[in-house]
Every structure is written in C-alpha cells, then in structure tokens.
Regions:
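Charged, non-catalytic interaction/linker regions at domain boundaries
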Residues: 2-288, 298-300, 414-458
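Amphipathic, oligomerization/interface secondary-structure segments
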Residues: 250-466
C-alpha cells in the first residue's frame, strides 16, 4: 500500500472506555516506509497496568480502539512497542507499530467475522481490460466526436464455489469539470463474497493472499494491494483497512506483456483460478515461488536468481514423482550385499559406504529432470530443441553454483547464465500450468504472446537442435 497519514484519534481498550474518558491516549497513525506506526506524543501505552494485562505471549496487544477527529470509529490490530523515550520527567513519547488500521462510520469487531472483502490490486485495470471502449470521429465542421460504449456486464465471475465467489467488478465514474469538459474514470476491483461469514484473519490468509499470488503469477509482476475494505457480518457499513502490504511496483505493465490476462483466462480449457486455489500444498509452494521470482527476477544477483529458478524446477521435477527407486525389501537386499562386500575394508571406508547407502533410495537430479521434460510433451519440444545439451549444462551449473565453486563459476558468461536462468523460470512456469490442467498448446500460446517470448527466443538459441 502507498504511504498515508490518518487523522489524530483518542485511543483506549474499547470504545466505551473512551466515551467514559477512561485510560485514553492521543495518537496519530501513519503508514510509511512499509510500517504502520502509532505515534503517541505524550504518554505511554505499554507501561500501563490495564494494557499489560491484555498482552499475549509475544507481548503484543491484540487490539486498540479509537475515535478520530471526524467522529469515525478506528481500530488497530496486533500492536507492538518500538521506542519509548522520556524527554523530561513525566513527559514520555512512545512509538508503536501495528498490523492493521481499520476505520468505519459505525462500531465493528476488528477481528470478527465478515461477509465480503473488496480489494484493488495494482495493474488490475490492465489485466482485466477496460469497461469502456471509445470511438473517435471527425464531423464535417472539423469537430471531434467521441462515442463511449460500456461493456455489457458490470462484473466477471472468476470463481463460483460452495464458500462463495470471486468477482472482478468494473466501475465508471463521471464528473463534470467545467461547462466544456467532462472527466470519466474507469476502474476495477476484486470482490470476495462469502456465503457464510468467515473471520477476517481467515479471509486474508485463505483467500486474499493466495489470490494475490495467483494474480502476480498471471500478470508476471507483483499484484500489490492498493486498497482494501470489508463488510462485517451483521452490518452494511464498510470498514476501510490499511496495512503494510508491499508497495506497488512503479510504472505501468501493459496487458500484451502479461502472460495471462482476464480475457484469456475466461477462454481457458480448465478453471485455472479454481485449480490454483484448490491445489495441494506441494504445488501451491511451487506456484508461490514462481510468483515471487516473476516479481523479483530483474533485481537479483544472477547466481542467486539461477539457484532459485533451479530450485523451482527441482520442485516441479519432484512433484508427484515416485519417491523410492526400490521397494524396502529390494533396498535391504542390495544394502546387505554391499555391506558384506566391504566388510573387510577399514572402518572409515565402511562408515563412508554405509552413510552413502542411507541415501541410496532416491532419484538423482538428472533422472528427475529427465522425467519432468518427458512429461511436458510438446511444450518442451518447442522450448528446448536440444534437451540433452540443456540437461548437461543445467546440472553442471547447479552443482558449481550451489557449492560456490569459484573456478567453475568463472566459466559461465553472465549473459548466458542470465538467459539460462530466465529460460528455466519460463520452463517451470509452463510446468506449473500443465500441472494445473492446461494443454501444451495453451502453454505455448501463453509464452509466444507475452513478455516470455523474448526469453524463449534467447533460451532456444542456447540449446539449438543438432
């Protein structure tokens, strides 16, 4: 979220205590530099007995309630002390940080159940497409005529499930500026509507954060939370929420650069949103790593980016791959045979062999990657013309860079290493999409018609067919 300063408020343990003038403190809240700060210019919060009695095991105050200068109801969640300074006897200045700042026109439970979350993500307008289309024409008198046409629907449902729905909602605002001009604003946001009330923390953890990762995965850049609000259970009053979510990336990302946009998603052969949110923990971990690498790839040191891309590829190689090469009985037979063969060797050698045997029932990196490439069919045939050369180089680079072999690392040209690393990320991206149910042709289409096309062209050039 962007930095913002909020109105000064009176704070207490609950709204009733403030109305009774009990245990009040005056303080201002600001969201700045990635932190949500409560600044108490005169007084201390965490040295009061009535406060310390409310602290949890982590010395965190679960909630603080307030009224601001405009008479609105405010609340802070999960407050921790940062600094406490005494400028003169009795003149204490305290600074605290919090996880959430909430504000509404009526009283609410800051950790209670809600029936709706509404979120605006960065780059969402480009991803979702405009609600308006404009037609320009020139009259015989030389005047420009503009005709605006709205799309038929005000919203598009991304997911309909037993728990509720996820919808992209469009909005158009019109405001006259002067007698000769008109300002028209076009925007979009995402609604999470719950059929049964859910607790706020669960809604953030189970729906908002995973969907944000899905959007980042589709956009190829961070889908940051710019605005957030909720509708508590039992009231129609909206609660606005501020929190130190990562700030939006600077500059626009145009939809032709994005791997998967909303219009493509609506025509996919499988319900990709549902498959992503419903994936098992192992695949979800790979999905989240891919989303974070897509966001950070341009700012990382090349060797570190390669290792994280290689880790992602290895996660996909191990996904649903059989864990054991041999049955327990066959493994025991082989181990007994080897042990009997080395029984006459000195103890140090025997111990070394026995330690190696404990790791002898897994699959090596080369075998796992070979099986993965075979399973990805036409996508890999198109992306990597020479799979043998790619596998050999990738395993060699991974071993050298993992163990920080300086002599080996120096052999790799930085541009080649960067092109290989980005290609591995695209390969892993395609593997995830195929595991989520898309066809090879759909994945190839995504790569060809997004910013991945440039990466794929360089990657294919590294490993041309013989």
């Amino acid at each position: 979220m962007n930095d913002e300063t909020f109105d000064v408020a009176l704070w207490g343990l609950d709204w009733d205590s403030i109305e009774r003038n009990e245990h009040m403190l005056q303080g201002s809240v600001a969201l700045m530099d990635g932190e949500l700060i409560l600044d108490i210019p005169f007084g201390t919060l965490f040295k009061r007995k009535e406060i310390t009695q409310q602290l949890d095991e982590a010395r965190c105050l679960p909630a603080l309630y307030g009224f601001d200068l405009k008479g609105k109801y405010c609340a802070l969640r999960n407050i921790l002390p940062v600094t406490c300074e005494e400028h003169f006897p009795g003149g204490t200045h305290e600074v605290c940080k919090a996880q959430y700042y909430m504000i509404s026109d009526s009283a609410f439970n800051p950790s209670g159940r809600i029936v709706k979350l509404r979120c605006r993500f960065s780059h969402l307008d480009q991803w979702a497409g405009s609600k308006l289309s404009a037609l320009y024409s020139v009259t015989e008198e030389g005047q420009v005529a503009v005709s605006l046409k709205e799309i038929p629907s005000d919203s598009i449902t991304l997911l309909q499930a037993e728990w509720g729905s996820i919808d992209v909602v469009y909005s158009v605002t019109r405001r006259s500026l002067t007698s000769t001009s008109l300002e028209i604003g076009v925007g979009s946001h995402v609604d999470f509507t719950f059929n049964e009330p859910v607790y706020f923390d669960a809604a953030i953890r189970d729906f908002l954060v995973p969907f944000g990762a899905f959007l980042s995965f589709c956009m190829g850049t961070r889908a940051s939370i710019e605005k957030l609000s909720s509708i508590p259970y039992g009231t129609a009053k909206c609660v606005r929420i501020a929190a130190p979510f990562p700030s939006p990336s600077k500059g626009n990302v145009f939809s032709p650069e994005m791997p998967i946009v909303l219009s493509w998603l609506s025509k996919a052969s499988v319900p990709l949103t549902e498959n992503w949110l419903g994936s098992d923990d192992e695949l979800k971990a790979a999905c989240n790593l891919a989303a974070s690498l897509l966001v950070c790839d341009s700012g990382k040191e090349i060797a570190s980016f390669f290792l994280e891309s290689a880790q992602l590829l290895e996660m996909m190689a191990k996904y649903k791959h059989e864990k054991k090469r041999f049955s327990d009985e066959e493994l025991k037979r082989r181990i007994d045979l080897v042990r009997s063969s080395v029984s006459r060797l000195d103890r140090e050698v025997r111990d070394w062999v026995h330690n190696r045997l404990n790791e002898a029932n897994g699959y090596g990196q080369h075998r796992l990657l070979t099986d993965l490439l075979k399973s990805l069919g036409e996508f890999v045939e198109w992306l990597i013309p020479n799979k043998k050369s790619f596998l050999s180089m990738h395993v060699e680079m991974r071993n050298s860079l993992t163990h920080r072999d300086s002599a080996g690392t120096a052999r790799y040209d930085p541009q080649m290493l960067a092109a290989h690393s980005q290609g591995v990320l695209v390969l892993s991206y395609g593997a995830i999409l195929i595991r989520l149910g898309l066809s090879d042709d759909e994945v190839i289409d995504i790569v060809k018609h997004s910013r991945f096309a440039r990466i794929a062209r360089k990657f294919r050039g590294l490993y041309p067919s013989n």
